[in-house]
Amino acid sequence: MPPDIHDVFGSALAALDTQQLRRHRRVVSALDGAMVQADTQPRLAFAGNDYLGLSQHPALIEAARQGAARYGVGATASPLICGHSPAHEALEQELARFVGLPRALYFYAGYAANAGAIPALVERGDALISDALNHACLIDGARLSRADLTVYPHNDLAALERALVAARGARRRLVVADAVFSMDGDLAPLPEMLALCERHDAWLYVDDAHGFGVLGEGGRGSLSHWRVPTDAMSSRLIYMATLGKAAGVAGAFIAGAPAVIEWLVQKARTFFFATGAPPMIAEALRASLQVIESEGWRRERLLQLRTRLACGLAALPWPAPASQSAIQPLLLGDNGTALRVMAALDAQGIWVPAIRPPTVPDGTARLRISMSAAHTPDDVDRLCAALLAASARPPV
């Protein structure tokens, strides 16, 4: 007799509880860019990825409203059937121009972009070389590809080169890395990585989910931040970025050489086997690109707030690695401490999520502090004061 489904998953959930690893959803409504209502209570949030505070921007809301009035609220089909509207076409052209690459392809989600593109680019018999701290969607894309996978230590260029040399017999070699690592906030050394790919005849696939809109001239992302030459970008590099973080809306795009993008149109299963995103989303994103470029004060405020936060965290007993992005980790070690400090902040009306394994390695549970241009200096000071009070409180 097969095991009872309730017993199987009830026991598995109980094991998660024992390890302090069960996650819980909260019912959240945005009040403004920095404040949310979570489980009916207002809280100052350092939890999301709305880095520029654009999710509530009037221009984006109005663009979405007009898009819905013109196109309706659904795409109705795959982009290869009848789900590719004039709004989607215009967005892709504007995204390509924005990042300085020849062509772009819009996906309904960042996870879908990576899970579909990577298996379209490499397959069994190819080599895929991945940073140890890459996001789960890059890891899953690598697994789905069935390429021979090598994982190199985080940002270790010497190890990356050894992996490239070891894979020289492969038909294709693809190096995959986040541009900004989502749980640490540090940057991948893209110029050096691209140089290694040039030297060893490999391609570089970059996920700029947390750099797009925040880094670079006019918010153009990590390629602009590192001043990667345009010719190198189009010949070796495949660029991906999400549009639900700094851009404030939803979806993702991949940009690169025209032949690469056309290949993804034909072979990325998450692109053509899914209904397209609503055209109203594309219109909101077109408005977002204009705001990202024109309202540079948002990036300037982020930089100022990051400096202020670093000064406040220096007074705490826990490590806070230097960050060049809108993400600031506070390393607490064990799951119990991370949950205790999160609860102490929550009691003060501040929401900062505790991040635990398997999202981060064992023994590195942390608070992931996400900054937004919607925050104020007083918000940062309030967070630092609450953390200092929590650090002085003995464990229960």
Curated annotation (Swiss-Prot):
It catalyses: 6-carboxyhexanoyl-[ACP] + L-alanine + H(+) = (8S)-8-amino-7-oxononanoate + holo-[ACP] + CO2. Transmembrane segments: none annotated. Homodimer. Its EC number is 2.3.1.47. The modification N6-(pyridoxal phosphate)lysine is found at K245. Substrate binds at R23, H135, T359. HAMAP family: BioF_aminotrans_2. This is 8-amino-7-oxononanoate synthase. Gene3D superfamilies: Aspartate Aminotransferase, domain 1 (3.90.1150.10), Type I PLP-dependent aspartate aminotransferase-like (Major domain) (3.40.640.10). Belongs to the class-II pyridoxal-phosphate-dependent aminotransferase family. BioF subfamily. Disulfide bonds: none annotated. Keywords: Biotin biosynthesis, Pyridoxal phosphate, Transferase. One of its GO terms (biological process) is biotin biosynthetic process. It is an enzyme of class 2 (transferase). Catalyzes the decarboxylative condensation of pimeloyl-[acyl-carrier protein] and L-alanine to produce 8-amino-7-oxononanoate (AON), [acyl-carrier protein], and carbon dioxide. Pathway: Cofactor biosynthesis; biotin biosynthesis. It comes from Methylibium petroleiphilum (strain ATCC BAA-1232 / LMG 22953 / PM1). One of its GO terms (molecular function) is 8-amino-7-oxononanoate synthase activity.
